[in-house]
Structures are given as C-alpha cells and as structure tokens.
Swiss-Prot record:
One of its GO terms (molecular function) is DNA binding. Disruption phenotype: Essential for growth, it can be disrupted once one of the components of the corresponding BsuMI restriction endonuclease complex (AC O34303, O34885, O35025, YdjA, YdiS and YdiR respectively) has been disrupted. Triple deletions ydiO-ydiP-ydiR, ydiO-ydiP-ydiS and ydiO-ydiP-ydjA lead to loss of susceptibility to MspJI, which only digests C-methylated DNA. Induction: Constitutively expressed during exponential growth. Encoded in an operon with ydiP and in a second with groES, groEL, ydiM and ydiN. This second operon is heat-inducible. Residues 84-427 form the SAM-dependent MTase C5-type domain. It catalyses: a 2'-deoxycytidine in DNA + S-adenosyl-L-methionine = a 5-methyl-2'-deoxycytidine in DNA + S-adenosyl-L-homocysteine + H(+). It comes from the Bacteria. Its EC number is 2.1.1.37. This is Type II methyltransferase M1.BsuMI. It is an enzyme of class 2 (transferase). The active site is at C176. Transmembrane segments: none annotated. Optimum pH is 8.0. Belongs to the class I-like SAM-binding methyltransferase superfamily. C5-methyltransferase family.
C-alpha cells in the first residue's frame, strides 16, 4: 500500500508500507531474485549458485550478492518491451550506471545508454567497454552544454540534442573536491561546484522523467549557492525530489562509505528514508568480498599490488610481526612522528572481520590510508579494490596502468547504492 507524505523539502513523497520487495530462492543450480513491482507483478533474475554446500545456513540475499560479484560472464537480461534511455554525466568508469543497469535487469527493463561524458580518458574508455553508449564525449560538459538556464539552445547544445535525441534518466556525479570532507571549508567555493548548473541545463534541455545526482555529504554545506539553486531549478522544472545520505556499510557493501543522493522525478518520488528500512543488511566484512582472491595468482597489474619502498615494506613487516593494525608513531615518518596528528589509520592494516575503510584512489599506497591487506604483506590489488567498490568480475576494466586503475576504481561510486535507489524508484 502507498501513502503520500510531506518530505523535508516540503514536497510530496510516496511512503510505501513495509513489504518484501526483494525475494530470493534457489532453483536448481541458480539463485533467483524476485522483485515485486508496484503493479503487483513479479520479475525474476538469476545468478549461478557459487556452491551447493551448506545452503541451508546461508542468507540467500547475501549469497546472491556474493555470487553476482564473482561472476565472470555478464548475467542474462530478459528481453521486454519496456526500455529506458540513460545518460551519465561525469560518468567515470560507470559505478552509477552499473547499479542502474542491474536495477533494470532486476525489473525486466531494457536499459539503453544514450550518452556519457567524462574528462578522464581512461575512465571513459572503461565506461564504453561496459555500456556501449550511443554517443560519448571525452571533454568538459561545459564546452557543449554552454547556454544559460532559460535561454534558447546554443549551437553546441543543438548538436548534442541532434545526436542524443531522447533521455529518460539522467545520472550525474559532478567532481566533488569542492565539497569533500577531506578538504577545508574554503574549498566549498570551488568553481567545480558550478558544474551542478550544467546538470540543471541538461535537465532543462531533455526533460527526463528521472534524475539521480550523487556527491559527498559535504555538498549540503555548499557556500557557492549552486546546490540551493539546483534544487530550486528542479522545482521550477516541475520535478518532485527527495534527498538522503546513504551509508554503504549498512546496505550490503563491505566498505564504510557515505554518499549524498538526490532523486528527482516528474511524478512523486518514493521516500528515500525507506531505503534503509527496506534494504538494510548486516554489516559485511572485507573477507566476504575478497576472500577468494587471497590465492588468486596473476602477474597482471589488475591482480598484483603496488611495489613499495624499502621503508614502507619494513612498516608492513612490523605490523605483521607485532600483530598490529595501526602503526605506532615510533615507526612513522617524521611528518607524523614529530607532531600531533589525527591520521591513525594511515599506514594501517585492514581488519578481516570488518568492512573496509573508504576506498580512495590512494589504495595502492600505505601512506594514503588503511590499505594494507589483512592477511598478506602488501596493499590491496585493483581487483580487490573493485570488489570492495561492488564491481563484479564481469565488469571489464581493460588494460590500464596502475595509476589509472587506482583513479577509476577509487573515484567510483559503489554500484550497490545506485542499484537500490533505481530499484526503489523505478519498480
């Protein structure tokens, strides 16, 4: 049953009474996920069971996610007449798109990726390998979407309109350094915050039925006014919206990562506060995500760890010899040892029985965070970082340089989050 409530933005949201939206069962050698749509109809999607041993004691939801992450081949998608045209602005390698793709698979919707744009050439190449967008741009969105809000189309915008034609669902994760909690408050005035207005312009030009924008929680402290202006523009364009900060650790991701989301729609949106109510899971440790990779032998960059200096190798040895997870000040470099600091986790070792810390593009360095493997005397590999970021093995990262792997994986959004948001709204 669905009721209407007034959300924090004084807009109507749909409040759905508690129901089992995701249901899981075993059918032969397959794990089946059945989604109950608002119409009452059920849609099923499958993954192969990893192991038939001890299934009676397994949480089938957890096992489904585990099996999906370990799939080497992309799972089948049932062909239906329902389809959706998706554009991903600031796409990166495609974390948001992957989650929406999986939500479409779960709902029996055919996703078509109409447009993607990103400045990072390596990230966009990964996106293109996995989603084959009809049109993509390895350039700044501002170069092509360059008109003022409310103004007639520019020549460049008309070219984009002619190429892309129709967008039903816009995804956008504008560069967030200007809002990041890792930066001081003065950087919230960063010019990159104005990129939100380019998202507003794309919305104005294409009038999609749905919009999902992602950023760091610090965006709510925006000093430039662009965030407030963005929400006001959604209202003037006739969109309902709701917003939330989600903690990935509580939603099935083996990682402590908080992200801000705003979902907008031409019809009242389902209350985002119900994401935690309907889809929360028990905390999943990193062992859940990467235990099968401990014995993974490979000599390619994706499956090997970074090389470290002799001094950092010695620090890793010290952690294991003394069964420690934090490096004492006495073993740290002078910049930490000789003055007070709050970087307790830096040079640290991951806990095997806990979720990982936030994965960043520094995951290959001992000095960038708690990225030393729990069981092995090395930092985590790109493959392990991808798993922790909820990228399955069938996702094709291609052949990149180590720094490129770290950038595209560390800057991504765990796909589980956009999966849940899209599932909650599109069903």
């Amino acid at each position: 049953m669905t009721n209407f409530i007034l959300n924090e933005n004084k807009q109507l949201s749909l409040a759905i009474e508690d129901e089992n939206i995701e249901n899981f069962y075993i059918d032969g050698t397959d794990l089946v996920r059945k989604i109950i749509r608002r119409s009452g109809s059920g849609v099923t999607s499958r993954v192969p069971v990893l192991s038939t041993q001890d299934l009676e004691n397994k949480n089938l939801h957890e096992l489904y996610d585990e099996s999906w992450l370990r799939m080497k081949n992309r799972p089948n998608t049932e062909l239906t007449t329902e389809s959706i045209n998706i554009a991903d602005l600031f796409s990166g390698c495609g974390g948001l798109s992957l989650g929406v793709w999986e939500a479409c698979r779960a709902l029996g919707i055919n996703p078509r990726f109409s447009f993607a744009c990103d400045l990072n050439e390596a990230a966009l190449s990964v996106y293109e390998k996995n989603f084959s967008p009809d049109f993509s741009l390895n350039e700044s969105i501002e170069k092509h979407i360059n008109g003022e809000l409310g103004a007639p189309l520019t020549v460049e915008e008309q070219r984009i309109k002619d190429k892309v034609k129709k967008i039903d669902f816009i995804l956008a994760g504008p560069p967030c350094q200007g809002h990041s909690d890792l930066n001081n408050h003065t950087r919230r005035k960063d010019p990159r915050n104005a990129l939100l207005m380019r998202v507003s312009r794309v919305i104005e030009l294409f009038q999609p039925s749905s919009v999902l924008v992602e950023n760091v929680p610090g965006i709510i402290h925006d000093k430039s006014g662009s965030f407030k202006e963005f929400k006001n523009h959604l209202k003037t364009q006739g969109y309902y919206f709701d917003e939330i900060v989600l903690n990935a650790e509580k939603l099935g991701v083996s990682q402590a990562r908080r992200r801000y989301f705003i979902f907008a729609s031409k019809t009242p949106v389902s209350s985002l506060n119900q994401i935690n109510e309907f889809y929360s899971t028990n905390s999943r440790p990193i062992s859940w995500a990467i235990s099968d990779l401990v014995e993974n032998v490979g000599d390619d960059i994706f499956n090997t760890a970074s090389e470290h200096s002799l001094e950092n190798k010695r620090r890793i040895e010290y952690l294991f010899e003394n069964n420690l997870f934090e490096l004492p000040n006495s073993e740290r470099p002078d910049c930490h040892r000789l003055k007070p600091h709050s970087y307790k986790s830096v040079y640290g070792r991951m806990y095997w029985d806990r979720p990982a810390p936030t994965i960043t593009r520094g995951f290959g360095s001992t000095g960038q965070g708690r990225f030393v493997h729990s069981l092995l005397k090395r930092t985590i590999t790109p493959h392990e970082a991808a798993r922790i970021q909820f990228f399955p093995d069938f996702f094709n990262f291609g052949d990149l340089r180590r720094r490129q792997y770290q950038d595209v994986i560390g800057n991504a959004v765990p796909s589980k989050l956009s999966y849940l948001l899209a599932l909650h709204q599109l069903r």
